[in-house]
Amino acid sequence: MNLKPQTLMVAIQCVAARTRELDAQLQNDDPQNAAELEQLLVGYDLAADDLKNAYEQALGQYSGLPPYDRLIEEPAS
């Protein structure tokens, strides 16, 4: 499956943002939910790995794309 670079960029940013939210929730939430949150984080981490691999391929095919690390940075408040 080939995705457009813009689609990959949006997906990477969304997964990174959700991962940050889940991490924060895991730190601040009721320990009873910890197992569920950790399971969700594993799924998001696997998705992030797949998206990173696809984006690295796109970097080789398209010019002008930002580095992956810039896409996953937490936005300044």
From Swiss-Prot:
Source organism superkingdom: Bacteria
Database matches in CDD domains: Tsi2_like
Disruption phenotype: Deletion of Tsi2 is lethal in the presence of Tse2.
Swiss-Prot/TrEMBL keywords: Disulfide bond
Entry annotated with the keyword Cell membrane: no
Keyword Disulfide bond set for record: yes
Stated role: Immunity protein that plays a role in preventing early activation of toxin Tse2. Binds to a large surface of Tse2 and thereby occludes the active site to specifically inhibits Tse2.
Quaternary structure and partners: Forms a heterotetramer with Tse2 consisting of two Tse2 dimers and two Tsi2 dimers. Formation of the complex inactivates Tse2 enzymatic activity.
Record's protein name: Immune protein Tsi2
Organism: Pseudomonas aeruginosa (strain ATCC 15692 / DSM 22644 / CIP 104116 / JCM 14847 / LMG 12228 / 1C / PRS 101 / PAO1)
Primary gene name: tsi2
